[in-house]
Amino acid sequence: MADEEVQALVVDNGSGNVKAGVAGDDAPRAVFPSIVGKPKNPGIMVGMEEKDCYVGDEAQSKRGILTLKYPIEHGIVTNWDDMEKIWHHTFYNELRVAPEEHPVLLTEAPLNPKANRERMTQIMFETFNVPAMYVAIQAVLSLYSSGRTTGIVLDSGDGVSHTVPIYEGYALPHAIMRLDLAGRDLTEYMMKILHERGYGFTTSAEKEIVRDIKEKLCYIALDFDEEMKAAEDSSDIEKSYELPDGNIITVGNERFRCPEALFQPSFLGKEAAGVHRTTFDSIMKCDVDIRKDLYGNVVLSGGTTMYEGIGERLTKELTSLAPSTMKIKVVAPPERKYSVWIGGSILSSLSTFQQMWITKEEYDESGPSIVHRKCF
């Protein structure tokens, strides 16, 4: 089955974007929004060939006439019919491959419910007829892609953030922490604070513009209060941004106020602890003997960790929480936006991994529950 010439497919299903491609590549071939759109008023255009559903970029570009849904919320699949459409689109439209000819590696959120892994397994074998598949935890793949097998991953994407301590390649489930604060919340917060400046962004189309402003202009201050003072005294931090209609807006302290919510969730009216505290709490739930290894290998992963200054700030915050003699190292790999996918590409190309696949035969013999025995 696992012949050298058959390439595995790697599909990382995020709340915001699907990253998909072929094992062995160094980056995903396809990255598109995890959206399914259905026409608001079906059949209104006479003689127009109208599909009953659009996926990804096409749904995004026709968003004016569609109702958009995200089938993955906070990292976990909540709508399986739409999820199936996304996978179908991934294989047939984006990668243009026949899934029945390739082993498929899928990713899942940490602490994904058992029933969900079984459902994924079932859909792959029964709907897409894959010859083999495997489900890997996203944060573990990120750690592999950084060349480590022990460390703590702070993975923050569009829908959810997690801190996942990993020892010798295994995630420690009792110490995993989840924070429902991620990219989408920051985009909404950015809309809110730009509103206070007099820029009204409200529609879902305008939300995409704000997301772009956030991604291009935001950064994380080393010291928030100092930065606020500096921003009052000078206009050095102001940057301008050209909107699609040619208007130009100016963005000032919003540039660092927006992502500051990662460290101070109270900005969003959330009671949760910030990412630094969550990381610390996660480490403290681990055995005292491995904490030193975790503090020395804090690995950032996911699109919401792409802000300039995040590594320095996290180092500073962890240093003040940890014992004074502790050596703290925060690693921010440049490719961390796609590190989950890259880790999957590496893992599924290893010769030692080939016996780990769940094969069609094993599935037919044991049913969906095989996933709990073979993927952990």
UniProtKB/Swiss-Prot annotation:
- Record-linked InterPro entries: Actin (IPR004000), Actin/actin-like_CS (IPR020902), Actin_CS (IPR004001), ATPase_NBD (IPR043129)
Sample GO molecular function, one term: ATP binding
Q: Which Pfam families match?
A: Actin
- What is the name of this protein? Actin
Q: Does the keyword ATP-binding apply?
A: yes
Q: Which domain of life is it from?
A: Eukaryota
Q: Which UniProt keywords apply?
A: ATP-binding, Cytoplasm, Cytoskeleton, Hydrolase, Nucleotide-binding
Enzyme class, UniProt record, top EC level: hydrolase
What catalytic activity does the UniProt entry give for this protein? ATP + H2O = ADP + phosphate + H(+)
Major subcellular location class: cytoplasm
Quaternary organization? Component of a complex, at least composed of ald-1, microneme protein MIC2 and ACT1. Interacts (G-actin) with ADF; the interaction results in inhibition of actin polymerization. Interacts (F-actin) with ald-1.
Function recorded in the entry = Actins are highly conserved proteins that are involved in various types of cell motility and are ubiquitously expressed in all eukaryotic cells.
The Enzyme Commission number assigned here is 3.6.4.-
What the entry lists under Gene3D superfamilies is as follows: 3.30.420.40, Actin, Chain A, domain 4
Gene coding for it? ACT1
Q: Where in the cell is it found?
A: Cytoplasm, Cytoskeleton
